[in-house]
Amino acid sequence: MRFSLALAAAGLAQTAFAAPQPSRGFGCGAPEPSEELLQVSQQFAVEEAQALAESYRSGNLTARDVTAQAISVKVYIHVVAASTALSGGYLTDTMINNQFSVLQSAFAPYGISFTLAGTDKTVNANWADDSKGYEMTMKRALRKGTYKDLNLYFLQKMGGNLGYCYFPTTASPGSTAYIRDGCTILYSTTPGGSSTNYNLGHTATHEVGHWFGLYHTFQGGCTGAGDSVSDTPAQASASSGCPVGRDSCPSQAGVDPIHNYMDYSIDSCYEEFTPGQQTRINSFWTSYRQNAS
C-alpha cells in the first residue's frame, strides 16, 4: 500500500539523513483490494474459523498452535539511488542490515523468518523517483528469485509516498503481476532515516504485511467484513500518531488496534500482529506463494 507523505522542502533534500523532516500524516494511495481478493479473504476467514473450532473440540491445539506452520522467505534488497551520496538515496550496508534486522524481529514471533539472499545498488535518477513511472522497467531489470521470494526496492523519492506493496495473487513467471510483485519503500524510512516518526524501519514491516496478504486494520470501516480477520477490532479510519484509547467504532467490540503494524500509526507505536493475522498470512502463503515458481 502507498503511504502519502508531503514532500520535504527542497532545501532539505540535500541533507536527507542529517536533518529530520517534519512529521506529516499519510494515507493509502494504492488501489483497494479487488472484489475477488476480498472474497478470497472472506473464504479464508470461514475456513480458519472452522479449523480453530475443530482444534478446540479435539483438545489437541491452542489458538496459536493452529498457526504453527513455519514460513521461511528469501529476501532480495535493491537500493535504487539518484547518486552515490546518502542524500541521493544510496543506503550504506549498515543501514540495509539494520532494516533487515527490524523485519526479522517484527515477524519472528509469528513463525516467519527471513534470509537475506542478496543486495544490489543501482544509480539511476529516473528509477530512483517512483513518480516518474519507471517501476516496471526497473523491476524487469532488478527483480530476482521466484514468486515466493520477497523483493524490496528502496528508492530516493516516492512521489509523496512512504511505500507500497502488492497482495498475493495468481501470477505466472513473466507476467505483469509476477514482475511487479514486492515492496517499494522510501529510503529515509529505514532505521535512523530522516522521515520523522517513520524512521524505525516499520514502513517495511507494514508493507511486507501486505505482501503476505494482510489488509489495513481499517479496511471496510465499522461495518461489513472489514479486514476479514476476527481478532482485529473494527476501525473507522486510519490512526494518526499514537492515539491510545481511540475508539472510532464505539458500537463494535474493542478499541482501535493502534499498535497493529497494519494501521497507520507512527513507528514507535507499532508493536504487533494478531494471532488471526498470523493465521491469515499462513492461508495466503499456502495458497499463493509456498509452491510458486
Swiss-Prot record:
Q: Where does Zn(2+) bind?
A: 206, 210
UniProt xrefs under InterPro entries: MetalloPept_cat_dom_sf, Peptidase_M43
State which residues carry a glycan (glycosylated).
60
Which pairs of positions does the record mark as disulfide bonds?
Answer: 242-269
Q: Under which EC number(s) is this enzyme classified?
A: 3.4.24.-
Pfam families in alphabetical order:
Peptidase_M43 (PF05572)
Q: Where in the cell is it found?
A: Secreted
Give the record's keywords alphabetically: Disulfide bond, Glycoprotein, Hydrolase, Metal-binding, Metalloprotease, Protease, Secreted, Signal, Zinc
Q: Where is the signal peptide?
A: 1-18
Give the principal location in a single coarse category: secreted
Tell me the superkingdom of the source. Eukaryota
Known role: Secreted metalloproteinase that allows assimilation of proteinaceous substrates.
Which protein, by its recorded name, is this?
Extracellular metalloprotease PODANS_2_14170
